[in-house]
Swiss-Prot record:
The keyword Endoplasmic reticulum applies. Pfam families: TRAM_LAG1_CLN8 (PF03798). One of its GO terms (cellular component) is endoplasmic reticulum membrane. GO terms for biological process: ceramide biosynthetic process. This is ASC1-like protein 1. The lineage of its organism: Eukaryota, Viridiplantae, Streptophyta, Embryophyta, Tracheophyta. It comes from Oryza sativa subsp. japonica (Rice). It is found in: Endoplasmic reticulum membrane.
Length: 309
């Protein structure tokens, strides 16, 4: 309790509205955030998720918790529970920081303001820096967790590519002064992943109604946020609107580098969205035919027998 109280006082003492330019040295804190997620997950796995998983999956049924099949079910539940905790916390944090900003509802303010600031010469608030460190720390941790901790699924390569691209996107968008855009990208991604992980946990817990509802919300949010809002609002702004404000004489060298590198990463993310949507759509059609919409998506039918962490 003493450590938590001290941390609370430290956070309360920070002026989160203070503005500063993004800098490479800010990422010196990244290893601390990665270790933070490692420790928190270990504690939740041992003292919270294990107990909840046993209760929801098996109820009062007497089972041997040391059997490999039993451990496999609990392990998958704990993975989804952990991801749900992160995505929900990340969504709440992103929305709390961005919701009242003008660029949350009008993409042109990604590039102008406050005052006479124009991209890329824009400062950001410390609270936005915190959102970035939180997300970058999680995905850095996730790369190692995917290799050494979590169940190896059949889309391991795609998931690893996603994590690496996400870390690169977060770091580069920060140092290239795209943090405003990045915070909204984080928010629209975390939202659909919350529904996905809730649906998985419901499926593992044999709660078919909740699994069906969560899966349908996941599909709807994926289409609206990742396949509609992301390309037609976010990518339009990063590829077109930004050029309307860029001082090409002042930034004739660094401006194009920032522009092409960041947009290349964003479009690669869109390619992954489309790839996963093809998988989701195929599974949705199959599940509608079998009248069982709650089955898992994005490769939960993993090759676990080939590799177990």
């Amino acid at each position: 309790m003493g450590v938590a109280a001290a941390a609370g006082r430290l956070l309360a003492a920070v002026d989160w509205e203070r503005e500063a330019y993004p800098a490479y040295r800010d990422f010196f804190a990244l290893p601390l955030f990665a270790v933070f997620f490692l420790v928190v997950r270990y504690l939740l796995d041992c003292f919270v998720f294990e107990w909840i998983g046993r209760k929801l999956i098996f109820g009062k049924e007497k089972v041997d918790y040391e059997k490999e099949e039993t451990r496999k079910k609990i392990r998958k539940f704990k993975e989804s529970a952990w991801k749900c905790v992160y995505f929900l916390s990340g969504e709440i944090l992103s929305l709390s920081v961005t919701y009242n900003e003008p660029w949350f509802t009008n993409t042109k303010y990604f590039w102008v303001g406050p005052g006479d600031q124009v991209w890329p010469d824009q400062k950001i608030k410390w609270k936005l820096k915190a959102v970035y460190m939180y997300a970058a720390g999680f995905y850095t941790y996730s790369i190692f967790a995917l290799m050494f901790w979590e169940t190896r699924r059949s889309d391991f390569g795609v998931s690893m590519s996603h994590h690496v691209a996400t870390v690169a996107l977060i770091v580069l968008s920060y140092v290239f002064r795209f943090a405003r855009v990045g915070s909204v990208v984080l928010a629209i991604h975390d939202a659909s992943d919350v529904f996905l992980e809730v649906g998985k946990m419901a499926k593992y817990s044999h709660c078919d109604l909740l699994a069906n509802v969560a899966f349908l919300l996941f599909v709807v949010s994926w289409v609206l946020l990742r396949l509609t809002y992301f390309p037609f609002w976010i990518l339009r702004s990063t590829s077109y609107e930004v050029l309307l404000t860029l001082d090409k004489k002042k930034h004739n060298f660094d401006g194009p580098i920032y522009y092409y590198v960041f947009n290349s990463l964003l479009f690669s993310l869109l390619v992954l969205h489309i790839y996963w949507w093809v998988l989701i759509y195929r599974m949705l059609v199959r599940q509608i035919k079998t009248r069982n919409v709650g089955d898992d998506v994005r490769s939960d039918s993993e090759g676990e027998d080939e590799h177990e962490d």
